Amino acid sequence: MYPSNKKKKVWREEKERLLKMTLEERRKEYLRDYIPLNSILSWKEEMKGKGQNDEENTQETSQVKKSLTEKVSLYRGDITLLEVDAIVNAANASLLGGGGVDGCIHRAAGPCLLAECRNLNGCDTGHAKITCGYDLPAKYVIHTVGPIARGHINGSHKEDLANCYKSSLKLVKENNIRSVAFPCISTGIYGFPNEPAAVIALNTIKEWLAKNHHEVDRIIFCVFLEVDFKIYKKKMNEFFSVDDNNEEEEDVEMKEDSDENGPEEKQSVEEMEEQSQDADGVNTVTVPGPASEEAVEDCKDEDFAKDENITKGGEVTDHSVRDQDHPDGQENDSTKNEIKIETESQSSYMETEELSSNQEDAVIVEQPEVIPLTEDQEEKEGEKAPGEDTPRMPGKSEGSSDLENTPGPDAGAQDEAKEQRNGTK
Protein backbone atom coordinates (compact mmCIF):
# COMPACT_ATOMS: atom_id res chain seq x y z
CA MET A 1 0.00 0.00 0.00
CA TYR A 2 2.85 2.42 0.85
CA PRO A 3 6.14 2.82 -1.07
CA SER A 4 8.79 0.42 0.22
CA ASN A 5 11.39 3.16 0.74
CA LYS A 6 9.11 4.97 3.20
CA LYS A 7 8.70 1.85 5.33
CA LYS A 8 12.40 1.72 6.04
CA LYS A 9 12.54 5.27 7.43
CA VAL A 10 12.40 5.84 11.13
CA TRP A 11 9.48 8.18 11.86
CA ARG A 12 11.31 10.12 14.60
CA GLU A 13 14.15 11.12 12.29
CA GLU A 14 11.74 12.02 9.52
CA LYS A 15 9.62 14.12 11.86
CA GLU A 16 12.64 16.01 13.16
CA ARG A 17 13.89 16.65 9.65
CA LEU A 18 10.55 17.89 8.31
CA LEU A 19 9.81 20.21 11.23
CA LYS A 20 13.14 21.97 10.71
CA MET A 21 12.49 22.65 7.03
CA THR A 22 11.16 25.92 5.68
CA LEU A 23 7.96 26.08 3.65
CA GLU A 24 9.85 26.41 0.38
CA GLU A 25 12.01 23.41 1.18
CA ARG A 26 8.98 21.30 2.05
CA ARG A 27 7.22 22.27 -1.15
CA LYS A 28 10.02 20.67 -3.13
CA GLU A 29 9.17 17.32 -1.53
CA TYR A 30 5.38 17.43 -2.02
CA LEU A 31 4.12 14.34 -3.79
CA ARG A 32 0.76 15.90 -4.68
CA ASP A 33 -0.79 19.20 -5.56
CA TYR A 34 -1.57 21.62 -2.75
CA ILE A 35 -3.91 24.51 -2.04
CA PRO A 36 -2.16 27.46 -0.34
CA LEU A 37 -3.91 29.31 2.46
CA ASN A 38 -3.95 32.65 0.64
CA SER A 39 -6.11 31.13 -2.10
CA ILE A 40 -8.90 30.34 0.39
CA LEU A 41 -11.19 33.31 1.00
CA SER A 42 -12.19 34.25 4.50
CA TRP A 43 -15.90 34.27 5.25
CA LYS A 44 -15.90 38.05 5.22
CA GLU A 45 -14.24 38.20 1.80
CA GLU A 46 -16.63 35.61 0.43
CA MET A 47 -19.67 37.53 1.59
CA LYS A 48 -18.29 40.76 0.12
CA GLY A 49 -17.90 39.08 -3.24
CA LYS A 50 -21.60 38.20 -3.34
CA GLY A 51 -23.26 41.26 -4.83
CA GLN A 52 -22.23 43.81 -2.23
CA ASN A 53 -21.28 47.31 -3.37
CA ASP A 54 -17.79 48.65 -2.85
CA GLU A 55 -19.15 51.59 -0.86
CA GLU A 56 -20.92 49.28 1.57
CA ASN A 57 -17.76 47.22 1.93
CA THR A 58 -15.74 50.34 2.71
CA GLN A 59 -18.22 51.37 5.39
CA GLU A 60 -18.20 47.90 6.93
CA THR A 61 -14.42 47.78 6.89
CA SER A 62 -14.18 51.11 8.70
CA GLN A 63 -16.82 50.17 11.26
CA VAL A 64 -15.60 46.62 11.94
CA LYS A 65 -12.12 46.83 13.41
CA LYS A 66 -11.65 43.14 14.15
CA SER A 67 -14.32 40.85 12.82
CA LEU A 68 -14.48 37.13 13.51
CA THR A 69 -15.47 36.67 9.87
CA GLU A 70 -11.86 37.45 8.96
CA LYS A 71 -10.73 34.46 11.00
CA VAL A 72 -12.94 31.72 9.52
CA SER A 73 -13.46 30.16 6.09
CA LEU A 74 -15.77 27.62 4.50
CA TYR A 75 -14.10 25.29 2.00
CA ARG A 76 -15.51 22.34 0.14
CA GLY A 77 -12.93 19.87 -1.07
CA ASP A 78 -10.15 17.46 -0.08
CA ILE A 79 -8.69 18.34 3.30
CA THR A 80 -5.44 16.47 2.53
CA LEU A 81 -4.54 19.11 -0.09
CA LEU A 82 -4.66 22.14 2.22
CA GLU A 83 -1.33 23.80 2.88
CA VAL A 84 -1.99 24.93 6.44
CA ASP A 85 -0.18 24.52 9.72
CA ALA A 86 -2.45 21.67 10.81
CA ILE A 87 -5.44 19.60 9.72
CA VAL A 88 -7.74 17.78 12.14
CA ASN A 89 -8.40 14.06 11.65
CA ALA A 90 -11.72 12.55 12.73
CA ALA A 91 -10.02 9.43 14.04
CA ASN A 92 -11.12 6.32 15.87
CA ALA A 93 -10.00 5.40 19.37
CA SER A 94 -7.00 3.36 18.11
CA LEU A 95 -5.62 6.21 15.95
CA LEU A 96 -4.47 3.53 13.47
CA GLY A 97 -6.58 4.64 10.54
CA GLY A 98 -9.99 3.59 9.32
CA GLY A 99 -12.66 4.67 6.88
CA GLY A 100 -13.79 8.06 5.67
CA VAL A 101 -11.56 11.06 6.21
CA ASP A 102 -9.37 9.11 8.65
CA GLY A 103 -8.32 6.64 5.95
CA CYS A 104 -7.72 9.42 3.39
CA ILE A 105 -5.37 11.29 5.73
CA HIS A 106 -3.36 8.17 6.59
CA ARG A 107 -2.93 7.25 2.95
CA ALA A 108 -1.82 10.77 1.97
CA ALA A 109 0.56 11.21 4.92
CA GLY A 110 2.43 7.92 4.42
CA PRO A 111 3.59 5.09 6.70
CA CYS A 112 5.45 7.35 9.14
CA LEU A 113 2.12 8.74 10.35
CA LEU A 114 0.89 5.26 11.24
CA ALA A 115 4.19 4.50 12.99
CA GLU A 116 3.91 7.59 15.16
CA CYS A 117 0.23 6.94 15.89
CA ARG A 118 1.11 3.46 17.19
CA ASN A 119 3.41 5.15 19.66
CA LEU A 120 0.51 7.28 21.03
CA ASN A 121 -1.42 4.30 22.47
CA GLY A 122 -4.82 5.41 21.26
CA CYS A 123 -7.05 8.32 22.35
CA ASP A 124 -10.23 8.73 24.41
CA THR A 125 -13.48 10.19 23.10
CA GLY A 126 -13.48 13.98 23.22
CA HIS A 127 -9.68 14.19 23.51
CA ALA A 128 -7.01 14.96 20.91
CA LYS A 129 -3.35 14.15 20.13
CA ILE A 130 -0.91 15.68 17.64
CA THR A 131 1.56 14.19 15.14
CA CYS A 132 3.67 15.36 12.24
CA GLY A 133 2.03 15.73 8.82
CA TYR A 134 4.85 13.91 6.97
CA ASP A 135 3.92 13.73 3.28
CA LEU A 136 0.95 16.07 3.68
CA PRO A 137 1.18 19.75 2.77
CA ALA A 138 0.03 20.34 6.37
CA LYS A 139 2.80 20.53 8.94
CA TYR A 140 0.82 18.75 11.69
CA VAL A 141 -2.13 16.38 12.06
CA ILE A 142 -4.36 16.70 15.13
CA HIS A 143 -6.24 13.45 15.81
CA THR A 144 -9.49 13.65 17.79
CA VAL A 145 -12.04 10.95 18.59
CA GLY A 146 -15.71 11.91 18.21
CA PRO A 147 -18.74 10.31 19.87
CA ILE A 148 -20.60 7.40 18.25
CA ALA A 149 -24.22 8.60 18.00
CA ARG A 150 -25.80 6.22 15.45
CA GLY A 151 -28.50 8.78 14.58
CA HIS A 152 -29.64 9.50 18.16
CA ILE A 153 -27.91 12.11 20.28
CA ASN A 154 -28.12 13.10 23.94
CA GLY A 155 -26.38 15.59 26.18
CA SER A 156 -23.33 13.38 26.57
CA HIS A 157 -22.89 13.10 22.79
CA LYS A 158 -23.09 16.87 22.39
CA GLU A 159 -20.60 17.46 25.17
CA ASP A 160 -18.15 14.92 23.73
CA LEU A 161 -18.34 16.51 20.29
CA ALA A 162 -17.79 20.00 21.71
CA ASN A 163 -14.79 18.65 23.65
CA CYS A 164 -13.30 17.35 20.38
CA TYR A 165 -13.11 20.92 19.08
CA LYS A 166 -11.97 22.35 22.42
CA SER A 167 -9.15 19.82 22.89
CA SER A 168 -8.02 20.32 19.28
CA LEU A 169 -7.95 24.10 19.72
CA LYS A 170 -5.97 23.67 22.92
CA LEU A 171 -3.25 21.86 20.94
CA VAL A 172 -3.42 24.60 18.31
CA LYS A 173 -2.61 27.19 20.94
CA GLU A 174 0.08 25.12 22.66
CA ASN A 175 1.95 24.42 19.40
CA ASN A 176 1.72 27.97 17.99
CA ILE A 177 -0.37 26.80 15.05
CA ARG A 178 -1.68 29.80 13.10
CA SER A 179 -3.96 28.03 10.59
CA VAL A 180 -6.03 24.87 11.05
CA ALA A 181 -8.70 23.00 9.06
CA PHE A 182 -11.54 21.00 10.66
CA PRO A 183 -13.52 18.26 8.89
CA CYS A 184 -17.05 17.26 9.90
CA ILE A 185 -16.40 15.18 13.02
CA SER A 186 -18.63 12.14 13.80
CA THR A 187 -21.08 12.84 10.94
CA GLY A 188 -19.91 9.88 8.84
CA ILE A 189 -20.12 6.28 10.01
CA TYR A 190 -20.47 7.48 13.65
CA GLY A 191 -23.94 8.74 12.76
CA PHE A 192 -24.03 12.18 14.43
CA PRO A 193 -26.78 14.25 12.69
CA ASN A 194 -25.24 16.77 10.31
CA GLU A 195 -27.04 19.96 11.35
CA PRO A 196 -26.65 19.59 15.15
CA ALA A 197 -22.98 18.71 14.56
CA ALA A 198 -22.48 21.88 12.51
CA VAL A 199 -24.15 24.02 15.19
CA ILE A 200 -21.89 22.58 17.91
CA ALA A 201 -18.78 23.10 15.76
CA LEU A 202 -19.63 26.72 14.87
CA ASN A 203 -20.70 27.67 18.39
CA THR A 204 -17.64 26.13 20.08
CA ILE A 205 -15.18 27.72 17.67
CA LYS A 206 -16.87 31.11 17.86
CA GLU A 207 -16.68 31.11 21.66
CA TRP A 208 -13.00 30.15 21.53
CA LEU A 209 -12.22 32.80 18.91
CA ALA A 210 -13.89 35.51 20.96
CA LYS A 211 -11.26 34.95 23.65
CA ASN A 212 -8.31 33.78 21.52
CA HIS A 213 -8.70 35.55 18.18
CA HIS A 214 -5.09 36.75 18.39
CA GLU A 215 -3.84 33.14 18.64
CA VAL A 216 -4.75 32.13 15.07
CA ASP A 217 -4.95 33.62 11.61
CA ARG A 218 -7.50 31.23 10.07
CA ILE A 219 -9.82 28.37 11.02
CA ILE A 220 -11.24 26.51 8.01
CA PHE A 221 -14.43 24.45 8.04
CA CYS A 222 -13.61 21.86 5.38
CA VAL A 223 -16.62 19.89 4.11
CA PHE A 224 -16.81 17.25 1.41
CA LEU A 225 -20.49 16.48 0.92
CA GLU A 226 -23.05 18.83 -0.61
CA VAL A 227 -25.42 18.41 2.33
CA ASP A 228 -22.77 19.59 4.79
CA PHE A 229 -21.79 22.51 2.55
CA LYS A 230 -25.40 23.80 2.48
CA ILE A 231 -25.81 23.42 6.24
CA TYR A 232 -22.57 25.25 7.04
CA LYS A 233 -23.27 28.00 4.56
CA LYS A 234 -26.64 28.66 6.16
CA LYS A 235 -25.42 28.42 9.75
CA MET A 236 -22.31 30.53 9.21
CA ASN A 237 -24.54 33.45 8.26
CA GLU A 238 -26.11 33.10 11.71
CA PHE A 239 -22.92 32.61 13.74
CA PHE A 240 -20.53 34.77 11.70
CA SER A 241 -22.48 37.61 10.15
CA VAL A 242 -20.44 40.17 8.23
CA ASP A 243 -21.01 42.92 10.84
CA ASP A 244 -20.33 40.62 13.79
CA ASN A 245 -17.59 42.36 15.76
CA ASN A 246 -15.11 40.62 17.93
CA GLU A 247 -16.64 40.56 21.38
CA GLU A 248 -13.29 40.89 23.08
CA GLU A 249 -12.43 43.90 20.91
CA GLU A 250 -15.63 45.59 22.06
CA ASP A 251 -14.61 44.99 25.69
CA VAL A 252 -11.20 46.51 24.96
CA GLU A 253 -12.85 49.59 23.40
CA MET A 254 -15.07 49.99 26.45
CA LYS A 255 -11.99 49.88 28.68
CA GLU A 256 -10.25 52.47 26.51
CA ASP A 257 -13.30 54.78 26.73
CA SER A 258 -13.33 54.40 30.43
CA ASP A 259 -9.57 55.17 30.58
CA GLU A 260 -10.10 58.27 28.48
CA ASN A 261 -12.93 59.49 30.68
CA GLY A 262 -10.98 58.58 33.79
CA PRO A 263 -8.56 61.53 33.72
CA GLU A 264 -11.47 63.91 33.04
CA GLU A 265 -13.37 62.53 36.02
CA LYS A 266 -10.20 62.81 38.08
CA GLN A 267 -9.79 66.40 36.97
CA SER A 268 -13.34 67.25 37.92
CA VAL A 269 -12.85 65.67 41.35
CA GLU A 270 -9.62 67.59 41.83
CA GLU A 271 -11.32 70.82 40.75
CA MET A 272 -14.11 70.22 43.24
CA GLU A 273 -11.55 69.64 45.98
CA GLU A 274 -9.74 72.84 45.04
CA GLN A 275 -13.01 74.77 45.11
CA SER A 276 -13.83 73.40 48.55
CA GLN A 277 -10.35 74.32 49.72
CA ASP A 278 -10.81 77.83 48.32
CA ALA A 279 -14.13 78.12 50.13
CA ASP A 280 -12.49 77.02 53.37
CA GLY A 281 -9.75 79.56 52.75
CA VAL A 282 -12.30 82.37 52.42
CA ASN A 283 -13.87 81.42 55.73
CA THR A 284 -10.54 81.30 57.51
CA VAL A 285 -9.38 84.67 56.21
CA THR A 286 -11.60 86.46 58.72
CA VAL A 287 -9.81 84.83 61.66
CA PRO A 288 -7.43 87.40 63.12
CA GLY A 289 -3.77 86.63 62.61
CA PRO A 290 -0.52 88.16 63.72
CA ALA A 291 -0.79 90.91 61.11
CA SER A 292 -4.19 92.00 62.40
CA GLU A 293 -2.89 92.04 65.96
CA GLU A 294 -0.03 94.29 64.87
CA ALA A 295 -2.54 96.59 63.18
CA VAL A 296 -4.51 96.83 66.42
CA GLU A 297 -1.34 97.65 68.32
CA ASP A 298 -0.50 100.38 65.79
CA CYS A 299 -3.97 101.80 66.23
CA LYS A 300 -3.45 101.78 69.99
CA ASP A 301 -0.22 103.72 69.66
CA GLU A 302 -1.91 106.28 67.46
CA ASP A 303 -4.68 106.66 70.04
CA PHE A 304 -2.11 107.31 72.73
CA ALA A 305 -0.28 109.88 70.59
CA LYS A 306 -3.20 111.75 69.05
CA ASP A 307 -6.12 111.12 71.45
CA GLU A 308 -8.35 109.55 68.83
CA ASN A 309 -11.77 108.10 69.55
CA ILE A 310 -11.82 104.60 71.04
CA THR A 311 -14.28 101.73 70.62
CA LYS A 312 -15.38 100.17 73.86
CA GLY A 313 -16.96 96.72 74.43
CA GLY A 314 -16.45 95.55 70.83
CA GLU A 315 -18.79 98.22 69.43
CA VAL A 316 -17.62 100.10 66.35
CA THR A 317 -17.69 103.90 66.80
CA ASP A 318 -19.50 105.77 64.10
CA HIS A 319 -16.97 107.22 61.65
CA SER A 320 -18.77 110.47 61.07
CA VAL A 321 -18.99 111.28 64.79
CA ARG A 322 -15.32 110.44 65.25
CA ASP A 323 -14.40 112.69 62.34
CA GLN A 324 -16.22 115.62 63.95
CA ASP A 325 -14.78 115.04 67.42
CA HIS A 326 -11.24 114.41 66.25
CA PRO A 327 -9.97 118.03 66.01
CA ASP A 328 -11.51 119.08 69.35
CA GLY A 329 -9.92 116.08 71.03
CA GLN A 330 -6.52 117.27 69.83
CA GLU A 331 -7.20 120.80 71.01
CA ASN A 332 -7.98 119.81 74.63
CA ASP A 333 -4.80 117.92 75.40
CA SER A 334 -3.74 117.94 79.00
CA THR A 335 -1.59 115.80 81.17
CA LYS A 336 -4.45 114.53 83.30
CA ASN A 337 -6.66 113.74 80.37
CA GLU A 338 -3.85 111.84 78.70
CA ILE A 339 -3.32 109.68 81.77
CA LYS A 340 -7.04 109.03 82.13
CA ILE A 341 -7.57 108.33 78.45
CA GLU A 342 -4.56 106.03 78.38
CA THR A 343 -6.00 103.99 81.24
CA GLU A 344 -9.41 103.76 79.59
CA SER A 345 -7.93 102.89 76.21
CA GLN A 346 -5.85 100.10 77.73
CA SER A 347 -8.90 98.54 79.41
CA SER A 348 -10.91 99.03 76.22
CA TYR A 349 -8.19 97.39 74.12
CA MET A 350 -8.03 94.39 76.46
CA GLU A 351 -11.80 93.93 76.25
CA THR A 352 -11.72 94.24 72.45
CA GLU A 353 -8.91 91.69 72.19
CA GLU A 354 -10.85 89.18 74.32
CA LEU A 355 -13.98 89.58 72.21
CA SER A 356 -12.09 89.26 68.93
CA SER A 357 -10.45 86.00 70.04
CA ASN A 358 -13.86 84.48 70.89
CA GLN A 359 -15.59 85.57 67.68
CA GLU A 360 -15.29 83.53 64.42
CA ASP A 361 -15.30 86.57 62.21
CA ALA A 362 -13.19 89.29 63.80
CA VAL A 363 -14.18 92.87 63.18
CA ILE A 364 -11.21 94.88 62.02
CA VAL A 365 -11.61 98.50 63.06
CA GLU A 366 -10.56 100.88 60.39
CA GLN A 367 -9.10 104.09 61.80
CA PRO A 368 -9.81 107.29 59.94
CA GLU A 369 -6.93 108.93 58.20
CA VAL A 370 -5.37 111.58 60.42
CA ILE A 371 -4.66 114.86 58.67
CA PRO A 372 -2.09 116.94 60.55
CA LEU A 373 -3.13 120.52 61.32
CA THR A 374 -1.32 123.39 59.69
CA GLU A 375 -0.10 126.43 61.65
CA ASP A 376 -3.08 128.56 60.50
CA GLN A 377 -5.53 125.91 61.62
CA GLU A 378 -3.77 125.67 65.01
CA GLU A 379 -4.07 129.46 65.46
CA LYS A 380 -7.78 129.36 64.62
CA GLU A 381 -8.31 126.52 67.03
CA GLY A 382 -6.41 128.47 69.66
CA GLU A 383 -8.67 131.50 69.16
CA LYS A 384 -11.75 129.34 69.37
CA ALA A 385 -10.61 127.61 72.56
CA PRO A 386 -10.96 130.55 75.06
CA GLY A 387 -14.60 131.07 74.09
CA GLU A 388 -15.60 127.59 74.97
CA ASP A 389 -16.97 127.02 78.42
CA THR A 390 -16.32 123.32 78.75
CA PRO A 391 -13.88 121.27 76.70
CA ARG A 392 -15.19 118.36 74.65
CA MET A 393 -14.10 115.02 76.01
CA PRO A 394 -11.85 113.06 73.67
CA GLY A 395 -13.20 109.76 72.41
CA LYS A 396 -16.81 110.78 73.02
CA SER A 397 -19.39 109.02 70.87
CA GLU A 398 -23.10 108.77 70.66
CA GLY A 399 -23.11 105.20 71.88
CA SER A 400 -20.64 105.60 74.81
CA SER A 401 -22.69 106.38 77.87
CA ASP A 402 -19.77 105.78 80.24
CA LEU A 403 -17.73 108.60 78.75
CA GLU A 404 -20.63 111.05 78.95
CA ASN A 405 -21.06 110.45 82.67
CA THR A 406 -17.33 110.72 83.38
CA PRO A 407 -16.59 113.96 85.31
CA GLY A 408 -14.21 116.38 83.66
CA PRO A 409 -11.03 117.86 85.18
CA ASP A 410 -11.32 120.33 88.06
CA ALA A 411 -11.71 124.05 87.44
CA GLY A 412 -8.17 124.88 88.47
CA ALA A 413 -6.73 122.62 85.86
CA GLN A 414 -9.00 124.18 83.23
CA ASP A 415 -7.95 127.74 84.14
CA GLU A 416 -4.33 126.71 84.11
CA ALA A 417 -4.71 125.23 80.62
CA LYS A 418 -6.45 128.38 79.36
CA GLU A 419 -3.71 130.64 80.71
CA GLN A 420 -1.07 128.48 79.04
CA ARG A 421 -2.86 128.70 75.68
CA ASN A 422 -3.33 132.51 75.98
CA GLY A 423 0.28 132.96 76.95
CA THR A 424 1.39 130.90 74.00
CA LYS A 425 -0.70 132.94 71.65
Curated annotation (Swiss-Prot):
Segments of this protein annotated with the region Disordered: 243-425
The EC number(s) this enzyme carries: 3.5.1.-, 3.2.2.-
Covalent cross-link (Glycyl lysine isopeptide (Lys-Gly) (interchain with G-Cter in ubiquitin)), residues: K170
Keyword Signal: no
InterPro entries: Macro_dom (IPR002589), Macro_dom-like (IPR043472)
Catalytic activity: 2''-O-acetyl-ADP-D-ribose + H2O = ADP-D-ribose + acetate + H(+); 4-O-(ADP-D-ribosyl)-L-aspartyl-[protein] + H2O = L-aspartyl-[protein] + ADP-D-ribose + H(+); 5-O-(ADP-D-ribosyl)-L-glutamyl-[protein] + H2O = L-glutamyl-[protein] + ADP-D-ribose + H(+); alpha-NAD(+) + H2O = ADP-D-ribose + nicotinamide + H(+)
Coiled-coil blocks: none
One of the protein's GO biological processes: response to bacterium
Effect of D102A: Reduced ADP-ribosyl hydrolase activity. Reduced ADP-ribosyl hydrolase activity
Summary of activators and inhibitors of this protein: Subject to product inhibition by ADP-ribose.
Effect of H106A: Reduced hydrolase activity
Domain Macro: 59-240
Compositionally biased region (Acidic residues): 244-262
GO cellular component: nucleolus; nucleoplasm; nucleus
Protein residues bound to substrate: 77-79, 90-92, 97-102, 185-191, 224
Biased composition (Basic and acidic residues): 302-343, 381-391, 415-425
GO molecular function: ADP-ribosylglutamate hydrolase activity; deacetylase activity; hydrolase activity, acting on glycosyl bonds; O-acetyl-ADP-ribose deacetylase activity
Keyword list, A-Z: DNA damage, Hydrolase, Isopeptide bond, Nucleus, Ubl conjugation
Subcellular compartments: Nucleus
Its biological purpose: Removes ADP-ribose from aspartate and glutamate residues in proteins bearing a single ADP-ribose moiety. Inactive towards proteins bearing poly-ADP-ribose. Deacetylates O-acetyl-ADP ribose, a signaling molecule generated by the deacetylation of acetylated lysine residues in histones and other proteins.
Subunit structure: Interacts with ADP-ribosylated PARP1.
Protein name as catalogued: ADP-ribose glycohydrolase MACROD2
Species this chain originates from: Homo sapiens
